[in-house]
């Protein structure tokens, strides 16, 4: 008798909903609505989405206007890097200041967190808006000081513009 009372709670409406595959019909209706909407797919090589001025891409080392390297070999970026991707060696100049002799970034280790850029007291290391680069071998993504300076020299106007646009938020 108790079994009959328990099955009585299952109504005829519920039976038709389950028998007629109501959930399947609702799912197909939802799929149909999205089928005829405007597509949001970006055809990447031809179309590009706008980048934020804070986008963190390929690293670069900057120079002062007189051509001197900005890096003072304080090694803060090396110390703060959570991935241990930065290696710095330095020498003392005749005037007592330090300058880097070796500044390497292993991009296979780098997580592009931006801590190196934030910790730099002279804005020497920056992350550029460049995200289209690749390496065919593991060593291709190991950037030396000369390579980083070349990137900085080539993209200095863009880097300076991004820094200026972001200055009021820092």
Swiss-Prot record:
EC number: 7.1.1.-
Entry's Gene Ontology BP terms: aerobic respiration
InterPro entries: 4Fe4S_Fe-S-bd, 4Fe4S_Fe_S_CS, NADH_quinone_OxRdtase_chainI
Keyword Cytoplasm: no
SUPFAM superfamilies: 4Fe-4S ferredoxins
An example Gene Ontology molecular-function term: quinone binding
Keywords: 4Fe-4S, Cell inner membrane, Cell membrane, Iron, Iron-sulfur, Membrane, Metal-binding, NAD, Quinone, Repeat, Translocase, Ubiquinone
Function as written in the Swiss-Prot or TrEMBL entry: NDH-1 shuttles electrons from NADH, via FMN and iron-sulfur (Fe-S) centers, to quinones in the respiratory chain. The immediate electron acceptor for the enzyme in this species is believed to be ubiquinone. Couples the redox reaction to proton translocation (for every two electrons transferred, four hydrogen ions are translocated across the cytoplasmic membrane), and thus conserves the redox energy in a proton gradient.
Similarity annotation: Belongs to the complex I 23 kDa subunit family.
Protein name: NADH-quinone oxidoreductase subunit I
Organism of origin: Acidovorax sp. (strain JS42)
Gene: nuoI
């Amino acid at each position: 008798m108790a079994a009959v009372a328990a099955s009585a709670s299952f109504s005829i409406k519920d039976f038709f909903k389950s028998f007629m595959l109501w959930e399947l019909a609702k799912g197909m209706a939802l799929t149909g609505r999205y089928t005829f909407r405007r597509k949001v797919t970006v055809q990447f090589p031809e179309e590009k989405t706008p980048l934020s001025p804070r986008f963190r891409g390929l690293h670069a080392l900057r120079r002062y206007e007189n051509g001197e390297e900005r890096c003072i070999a304080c090694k803060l970026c090396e110390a703060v890097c959570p991935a241990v991707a930065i290696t710095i060696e330095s020498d003392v100049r005749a005037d007592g200041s330090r300058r880097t002799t070796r500044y390497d970034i292993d991009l296979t280790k780098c997580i592009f967190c931006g801590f190196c850029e934030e910790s730099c007291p002279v804005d020497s290391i920056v992350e550029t808006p460049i995200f289209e680069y690749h390496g065919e071998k593991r060593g291709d993504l190991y950037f030396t000081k000369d390579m980083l300076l070349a990137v900085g020299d080539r993209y200095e106007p863009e880097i300076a513009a991004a820094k200026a646009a972001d200055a009021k938020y820092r």
